[in-house]
Amino acid sequence: MAPWSGFWAASRPALAAAAAGGTPVVVKMDNPNWSISEIDADGGEFLAGGRRRGRGKNAKQITWVLLLKAHRAAGCLAWLASAAVALGAAARRRVAAGRTDDADAETPAPRSRLYAFIRASLLLSVFLLAVELAAHANGRGRVLAASVDSFHSSWVRFRAAYVAPPLQLLADACVVLFLVQSADRLVQCLGCLYIHLNRIKPKPISSPAAAAAALPDLEDPDAGDYYPMVLVQIPMCNEKEVYQQSIAAVCNLDWPRSNILVQVLDDSDDPITQSLIKEEVEKWRQNGARIVYRHRVLREGYKAGNLKSAMSCSYVKDYEYVAIFDADFQPYPDFLKRTVPHFKDNEELGLVQARWSFVNKDENLLTRLQNINLCFHFEVEQQVNGIFINFFGFNGTAGVWRIKALEDSGGWMERTTVEDMDIAVRAHLNGWKFVFLNDVECQCELPESYEAYRKQQHRWHSGPMQLFRLCLPDIIRCKIAFWKKANLIFLFFLLRKLILPFYSFTLFCIILPMTMFIPEAELPDWVVCYIPALMSFLNILPAPKSFPFIIPYLLFENTMSVTKFNAMISGLFQLGSAYEWVVTKKSGRSSEGDLIALAPKELKQQKILDLTAIKEQSMLKQSSPRNEAKKKYNRIYKKELALSLLLLTAAARSLLSKQGIHFYFLMFQGLSFLLVGLDLIGEDVK
């Protein structure tokens, strides 16, 4: 018994620590002279082999292996249990707090209409499920009242004659739209594949290698012909978490100081934030940067008004190009060197757009799912449109405009909340070409809370519908090629901005659960499962490290369809919430190494130390009492909760009719809506 007692004495403290919630341990046995395959072999053969080898293989050694496996299984179960407990505790906090999305900035009228429709659908589905359960129980021999039996028979005849045909017609129409949109996405993916296989890449007319060989030193006064005058704008509004990082990054752009001017366009209404930004600008000005601070007294037009006001300065006429960076963007020092050369000897080029990269893409599940979406947007949509038709929607930041293109297109307009798409469409109608550089990245942040992401998506999907209403007459009258008009109207606006959110919400959140209660109208399995799975697979290809999240991504995209549908309707019919502009909340995430890397080699050590201090100051500000006064809360989202109950009710009905694929889809989609409705995805504010 000595070996067993020795083993137990050695492993008992570690096992006790693991049982108490400590770090899982692995028990190591010295000189194991057997394998798992030997243990799984026939018992007699195993013992015989043991005798032949003269080894003491016995039941105690097998017990050790089973103990290790049991310990590993217990650790897994303990992790699942702790996760479930934490999830339940978070849900209880949300319900106890009682904070709903009624406090959001959206206008109540359109939101309440959609919520009333979803709630009515939920009540109807619960009633129909009760009727079906009563009929099901009656079929098993239970006694039902004659009135209930008569009602069920009348309902079956009524739904077959009057409800199922229009529902099936609507379902078929949505399926057609779904297939058209899927075909469009497949064509874009094939275009991206063609670009990668043939290594197609936008190149300046003067090759970068030749230009680099010919470029003199940056401090050479004769270098002006190679380094045109560039204006850099940083619009911001109450974004004290990130202003230091963006100003530091822009002030360290590798460009002759005499040929660059930085405009910090501060629309903050908080005096403390204004003072902090002024101090930061003054610090960099004293260090030799050409930088100015601008603050508007009349803050009209949101970001578009801010940019329009800045372009009205008298000194702008001395500059040829303007680079725009939002407050959370941190361009690398060589950004201008890799973008501006594309304008040289290319007078038709109006915009050079870089792609985004994200400093917090692994922060939580919400940021991981956003990263999948945006990787597909840049890698496939922007790159394919830029290569093949020289047009895409300007992303509003991390881009360089030819100032002449902005002026010829009417400049910045305040008529919509998507001023970036507005100027891009007008520039395209005026014949300007765009270039997208997939290999030039600019770091930024993703929204970490569902509330911030939801408001951002509402603005991004309501604005295009506003713009479509305003631009449609101009597109029809414009003297451009017919195929360009067709691309703008049918692909850019209708298919990708209107049809996509419409069928996503209508087909998967309303029609599909209704077909469970009206079985005469059907949706085939390939619509519910196979095609969406294929589209999710294509979407996740540009971010291969995110493959473990393919199922959460599919469910989350359908969950977001309610927000996108509501935004699309608001923009299309000019409802109040379509005109709201809410600045996306920032966290100020950036590594110290990233900030130090922003500094050019010729900067003194003191400036590098200043950059290092930015991170420390940012952390101190985030923990200061002044910031603690402004509290953040997790909310309960009523539309998402109502949809979760609707889908789970439909899942229960599909279980009665033994529709396997429909049941699993409805159940998991309902749980997804439940998690989002309780704000259990993204940042957890305690």
From Swiss-Prot:
GO terms for cellular component: Golgi apparatus; Golgi membrane. It is found in: Golgi apparatus membrane. It is an enzyme of class 2 (transferase). Probable beta-1,4-glucan synthase rather involved in the synthesis of the xyloglucan backbone than cellulose. Seems to work simultaneously with xyloglucan 6-xylosyltransferase. Xyloglucan is a noncellulosic polysaccharides of plant cell wall and consists of a glucan backbone substituted by xylose, galactose and fucose. Keywords: Cell wall biogenesis/degradation, Glycosyltransferase, Golgi apparatus, Membrane, Transferase, Transmembrane, Transmembrane helix. The chain crosses the membrane at residues 114-134, 160-180, 498-518, 523-543, 640-656, 661-681. The gene is CSLC10. Coiled coil: none annotated. The active site is at D267, D420. Belongs to the glycosyltransferase 2 family. Plant cellulose synthase-like C subfamily. This is Putative xyloglucan glycosyltransferase 10. Signal peptide: none annotated. It comes from the Eukaryota. Its EC number is 2.4.1.-. It comes from Oryza sativa subsp. japonica. Its main location: Golgi. GO terms for molecular function: glycosyltransferase activity. GO terms for biological process: cell wall organization. Pfam families: Glyco_trans_2_3. It is a multi-pass membrane protein. Substrate binds at D326, D328.
